[in-house]
């Protein structure tokens, strides 16, 4: 998935999506590994999810195609990320104002071109790229614009099919509303894993 909302798929898991060619002004946004017969589930910045059969996506040999040709996101929405895998697999969904939850991939799949609302985002808030949660012992790491990083066990994040979620990072509502302080990154680290912060 590119920052401009273009999508493509490549066979094999040894491909580095950051090294692919992108249109001028476009670049890498998010990627996921899965199998061709699984649905690719996209989430946009307004908290809506959409599903596309992965095998129907264009090849990575070209520049791909805009997702807006297949889906009908709300005006002003951009695609934030993509998910694939086991339908029972958990994914962390987080808004940049500090709220989030985990959801089963099967609860995010929809056949509607307009998608379905899964993460309630306050006006002015945006959804961050989703992260796969492989174990309740995994660490959820969230970072804000002031350089603070918080890590806590994934088991502390509620599982729900949709909603606003719990406050994962305390951002004063006035600062969130003015976009002065926000979450800028989220990652899930497995036991024994590491995190590099840029």
What do these predicted ranges mean?
Residues 1-198:
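Short, structured "edge-of-domain" segments at secondary-structure transitions
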